[in-house]
Every structure is written in structure tokens, then in C-alpha cells.
Amino acid sequence: MTKKQRALEIIERLKKEYPDAGCSLEYDQALLMLVSVRLAAQCTDARVNIVVEKLYEKFPDVDALADAPVEEIEAIVKPCGLGHSKARDISACMKILRDKYQGKVPDDFDELLSLPGVGRKSANLVMGDVFGKPAIVTDTHCIRLVNRMGLVDGIREPAKVEKRSFGRSFRRRKAAISATDWYITEERYVLPEPILIAKNAVSVISVKKSVYKSWW
């Protein structure tokens, strides 16, 4: 079995095992996802969802967040940890969205990367889940799993894993498979290993032994 065939087979098995998988971050617009992924660093999605709801109640749009004192943002996001740096990034990011992008979240990967507090992992998450574009959220958990599954060979650098994975034919929309079918989160369900995603953009599921035991 080629690596391309293995990748497609893995995704198909996971889609059958978890047909209703979904992203655990709650959002109904690009702005909320952008804020959520910044707050999610070293924090659970469940707590992020609670905090973002409170933040959005007080500051319901880009303009409100851009004008808000950093101290007020920090007071709300503090339960997520790293409150000062996260509040500072959110404030700076909202100012750029207001002044450069007419209050809209850009759907271009490089433009997302230029925003304060947005790295490759966050940019890929927004690109895949919000805009439905091919994207791979590559973190240490993803790297460990794709190496274990044999989809990459001993590659540990996130950017290289991302690039190599894009070459595995995840772009085949007709087969309902794209690079956005992969996402790793630190939450754990069945295994003490991180969860693997396999359903459109960033659908969160845990990998059961019955699903993957024959992959390596």
C-alpha cells in the first residue's frame, strides 16, 4: 500500500467510525474562531467557549474589541491563562482588522499569519474550519501520529510535515477528502494519545484501537 493509499484509507475508516465528529470550539463567525484559537493556547476548549461568550457579550464586534482597553479584555480572558499576552494580541489584532481589512477576517493564509498572536497552527485552523480551504493543523500530536501511521518518515518540523502531507492527495474534493481532514487537539477521549481529526475542516474525534490497530 502506498502512502497515498494509506492516507485515504485512514481517513475513510475514521469517517465511518465517527460520522458526526465536530469541532469543539463554538463559533458562528470567523471573528469568534480567530479569538478562540488565540485563547485556546494552554487552555481547554470548554473554558474558551465560556470566556469567548462573555467577551462577545461585552465587545460584540471588531470595532468594540479594537476600542476596548487591554485591561478590560484581560479581565475577561484571564481564566484562559496568559491573560496579559492574549489580551494584548487580541487588541492589536482587532485594530489591524478594523484599519486594514474593513473589520473582516482575511481568508488568505499569509495575511492571517501577519496578525498578532496567529501562528501556522491557528492560521490553518481558521482556513480549514471557517473558510473550508485545504489546511493541516500541525502540532506535536499531529506529527507523532502521522509518523506512527507511516504518512511521513521521521519528519518532525511542523512546516515540513504540513508540506509533505499536502502532497498526499488530500485535495481530492470528489472523494470528500482534503487536507482539512486532519487536526489534532490536546484533549483526550479514549486513548492517552491526542485525538485525530477526520471529517472536513477540523472535526474532533478520538482514535480507537479498533480503528487504527492495523495501520502500523
Please give the residue ranges for each predicted region.
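Catalytic cores of DNA base-excision repair glycosylases
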Residues: 2-216
